[in-house]
Structure formats: C-alpha cells, structure tokens
C-alpha cells in the first residue's frame, strides 16, 4: 500500500468535509505533486461510502487521459478505461463535443463524480462567454453532477476568461481555491525537485548590415538589447545554429552529470515547430546524443512517448506533445526553445521536469534564452520560492572577453570575427528569406563563443 503524501492526506480530509455541504471542490497543486493520485483516492472514498455510482474524468490530451486511467485502475482496483465500466471512465475534453445524448444522461440518472484535470482549459461561467469545452460543462455537467473536482497546476488563462466551475472573489476577482499546494511547499517537503532555471545570454553580439556598397557593424551586449534595438526577432535566435549549439551543449553537460548519479535520467527539448524539431535533432545527432522526435505528424507518437518513458534514450524533442500532465518521471533537464512566451505554457513545461524518482532526486534544470519576457517569468517562479537567491554564473569569461569588448568599442572587428566560430546569415539559418531593413539590406548575425548563465535556484 502506497502511503499518501502529507498534502494529499490533508487535502483529502478537507474534501471529505467540504462535500458534506458543497458540491464543487477546486484544488490548485503544483505540477508533479500528485494531483491525479489525490483525485483517485477521493473517488475511492466516495465509492466506498456509496455516495456516488460512477466517476467520469476529463483531461486535455490522450496522454494525460491514459495516465489517469492507469492511476484510477490501480487505486480503485477496478477497470477504468474509455468506456463506462464498473467504476467509470476518462475522456479528453475534445471528445465532449462528440458525445451522444445517452452519455450526458448518465449525469442525470446516476450519482456521478466529475473530475476535470487542468480545468483552466475550460473557460466561462455562462454560455456567451465560454469556450467550447466550457459550454459543454455548463450545459451538461454543472447542474447535473453530484460532485465535481477541479484540478489545476496553473490556474489561469492567457485570455483572462474565468475558469469553468471556479469561484472568484468580488471585487478583486481573485480565484478562490478550496485547497492550494504551492511550489515552495512541494520543494520544502521533498515532493518535487527544486527547479534550477538558467537564463543563457551572450555578452558580445555582432550584427553586420550590408546595404548597396556599404557595410555597417553594430555590437550588442545581451539578447535583450539585440531584440529591442534591431530587426532580429526572438524566433531568429531560436533558429540560429550558434544559439542552438550553445543551449544544447549546456543541457547535454548537465544531463551527463545527472546520469552519473541517475543513469535513467532524460532530457526534454521543447521545439517551436516540426522543422525546428528536426533542426535540433540534427544537432543532437552530430553531438552523438540518443534522441527521439515527437510531433503531431509523427506516426505512433504516443507509443514513442511510452517507450521513452521506460527506456534509456537521452533526449526527447517535442512540439506540443510533452504537455501538462504528461508523466515521465525520468525527465530532469529541459531546454526551452519554443516561440510560445506565455506564463501558462512556461510553467507547464517546467512542471514536466519536477516529478521525483526517489528521495535523492532533488534537482531539475531548465535552460532558456534570456529573452525579457521569459526572464520575467523565471523571476516570478523564483519569487514563489522565498528562500531562493539569484546568483550569477559566468563560464568561460576571461581576459579575452574584455579584449573583445575593447575591440568593439574601438571599431576593430577582427577579434569579434575570430570569436564567432561560424557566422550565419539570417537567410541561411531560417530558410524564410533575408532579414531586411530596406529592400537592399542583408543582416548577418554572429555571436561570441562566450555565454553567460544566470542561475535562479533554490539555495
């Protein structure tokens, strides 16, 4: 028998008391802390007390649904699949649109516990201001289910719409959680790994603009300055081989160190699109790293994810496949190279590497380009851990860097050219045409081989 974690037992007791007089219960718990196990234990208690007849679960993806089916089958010791069996079933939110009326009649004819994992995907309190999934909940479940359980690790939406079944304070409009288990508590109690978020920057960036018969050179001291004062975009950086090599080298080094202690540890690379994923895969291959690529176009992607979960492959490169709720405990290192810059998505990705494999498995590493928005999100996560101290690590910074700065200041670009191993034009590296300021302007971007690492970590 697996003993519940302290927070799970506490939340379970509070839920039992809450359901004596209320129908809806909302839990916010940090990703990787065991929300699904809590939900299964609560369902087991309600079934044993004969307060419900069935349990019906909804989740955002088939991968998460499969994980719920495994957990509920184990805890309930009964079949739990994608059809109503002895205990219940689990479905994707998308499937709600295609359910027949007979399915929704179950909520009217029987006592049902409806569980919504990552319920922030379902928006709205009324049909006019709801998304499709939220409308299904309002129409078919909200007033029909005997009990509801809403679960979320990141309980907000990028569009600021209210979450279905959630309650908000008035007039502040703050989400009211019946139980909250935050990242600080999860780390302090050893439930989750401590996140080590490393922002990767470059102190010596060279941008050459060729226009007609003239050439101008501009220098930048960080990515933030480059992005704000030049036509170069964040996605240009993500697709630049120099940047990819730098980020992946750091990730590979950390994964290698981790695998010395935990041989089955694996890494995740979050890519921008399918083309980008294969670009990253080519670099990993050149560095003799084992990997698998999973995208929406990958045949049998779910089987590949399941295989990676249990094998010894170093890296999984994913585009929107290793998402919230995906349980791959051996993931402990992540290179975030997605163009998506929302706090919701960023925290969800971080959650993929927080699950622990054992008591000695204490750290998770997230590597990200020091883009201003992602820097802000990283600092907010650090602020969730009051004991955190922001430290600066600079590797490979020496007198040569100072010399290169002086050469730039004096207009001498020879040293800068030597420090850029392989200057690549925007045209060559993104395949989408030249990056132009005017019709006759070509920009060539190159970087110093020296990268700064800003480490935000729990000390």
Over which residues does each language-model region extend?
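Conserved RecA-like P-loop NTPase helicase motor core
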Residues: 290-394
